[in-house]
């Protein structure tokens, strides 16, 4: 008789954003005229940018012509023309990437959860708290021990490593979801040194790097020496295309 994975019983009853949606709906039912800034799930706020629409149309047209049609690519890691474009994007930050160091997958969220499948279930996982739910849930489902580094006002919402605490896998998100804090170059140097001392791997979620404006805040952990030896970076190139409008951002800043 099949048995269940009892680790799933360690998860919350509902996905975090389902609970947030229920609370929002209840609040709006009681306060229909109240202004509300939604800070739950990251839904789009504007129509897709015209340049993206035209690019997708062009791509669809190419698939209808024998000379430009593309099927599966051979490597399983993404078309070379796309990986070259990604490498060019990283060059803006002074980061040099070989094509075999780049993998195109179905999204940063999926990768942050699925990447741990290649690691043993006995690894200790360090996650900054608060954190994006997928970091915690994906590891709890596999029965791993999850420990936390608190991000709060006392440290500027930028949790730093405790040399007395051991971890095998480390999740960092910069700029952070949900706090918005971002690690400086010196802070990332400290995390890299900690990872090397523990022979640990950093899983670095850089999905929101496009919103960084401070020159002292790296867009990629690979801007910091030694990162390639201990870090796997997940990035997204979709966050600026209608995901956050200037009007929306200014409203948040005013609060």
Placement of each model-derived feature along the sequence:
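Glycine-rich "substrate-gating" loop/helix at the edge of Rossmann-like oxidoreductase active sites
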Residues: 8-12, 179, 237-239
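Active-site PLP attachment segment
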Residues: 223-251
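N-terminal small-domain helix-loop-helix segment of the aminotransferase-like
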Residues: 3-6, 10-106, 114
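Walker B catalytic acidic pair
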Residues: 206
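Conserved core of the PLP fold type I
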Residues: 67-195, 209-228, 232
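Short catalytic/ligand-binding loop motif for oxyanion handling, primarily in non-cytosolic enzymes
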Residues: 45-49, 178-181, 211, 241-243
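Residue-level marker for buried hydrophobic side chains located in beta-strands
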Residues: 202-203
């Amino acid at each position: 008789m099949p048995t269940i994975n009892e680790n799933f019983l360690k998860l919350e009853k509902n996905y975090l954003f389902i609970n947030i949606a229920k609370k929002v709906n209840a609040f709006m039912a009681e306060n229909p005229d109240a202004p509300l800034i939604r800070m739950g799930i990251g839904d789009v706020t504007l129509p897709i940018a015209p340049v993206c629409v035209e690019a997708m149309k062009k791509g669809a047209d190419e698939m209808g012509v024998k000379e430009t049609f593309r099927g599966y690519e051979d490597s399983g890691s993404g078309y070379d023309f796309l990986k070259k474009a990604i490498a060019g994007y990283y060059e803006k930050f002074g980061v040099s990437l070989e094509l075999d160091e780049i993998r195109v997958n179905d999204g940063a969220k999926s990768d942050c959860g699925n990447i741990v499948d290649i690691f043993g279930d006995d690894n200790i996982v360090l996650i900054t708290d608060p954190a994006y739910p997928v970091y915690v849930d994906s590891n709890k489902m596999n029965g791993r021990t999850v420990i936390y580094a608190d991000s709060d006002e006392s440290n500027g919402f930028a949790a730093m490593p405790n040399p007395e605490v051991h971890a095998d896998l480390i999740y960092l998100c910069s700029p952070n979801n949900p706090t918005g804090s971002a690690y400086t170059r010196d802070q990332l140097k400290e995390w890299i040194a900690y990872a090397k001392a523990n022979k640990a791997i950093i899983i670095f979620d850089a999905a929101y790097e496009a919103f960084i404006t401070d020159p002292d805040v790296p867009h990629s952990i690979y801007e910091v020496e030694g990162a390639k030896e201990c870090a796997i970076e997940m990035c997204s190139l979709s966050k600026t295309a209608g995901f956050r409008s200037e009007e929306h951002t200014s409203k948040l800043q005013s609060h």
